[in-house]
Amino acid sequence: MKVRPSVKKMCDKCKVVRRKGVVRIICENPKHKQRQG
């Protein structure tokens, strides 16, 4: 899980999800998991 000020899709399979006001990226590739914070 990467925590970044700005999250971007890293590949076609990345999805942007908002959970409790937090923007997250979920993907098949575990390296692409990100959270904004």
Curated annotation (Swiss-Prot):
Alphabetical UniProt keywords: Ribonucleoprotein, Ribosomal protein
GO cellular component terms, A-Z: cytoplasm; ribonucleoprotein complex; ribosome
Q: Which GO terms describe its biological process?
A: translation
Alphabetized InterPro entries for the sequence:
Ribosomal_bL36, Ribosomal_bL36_sp
One annotated GO molecular function:
structural constituent of ribosome
Keyword 4Fe-4S (UniProt) = no
For whether the record's keyword set contains Ribonucleoprotein, the answer is: yes
Q: Which family does it belong to?
A: Belongs to the bacterial ribosomal protein bL36 family.
PANTHER family reported in the protein's UniProt record: 50S RIBOSOMAL PROTEIN L36, CHLOROPLASTIC (PTHR42888), LARGE RIBOSOMAL SUBUNIT PROTEIN BL36C (PTHR42888:SF1)
Listed HAMAP family: Ribosomal_bL36 (MF_00251)
Name of the protein this chain belongs to: Large ribosomal subunit protein bL36
Q: What organism does the record attribute this protein to? A: Campylobacter lari (strain RM2100 / D67 / ATCC BAA-1060)
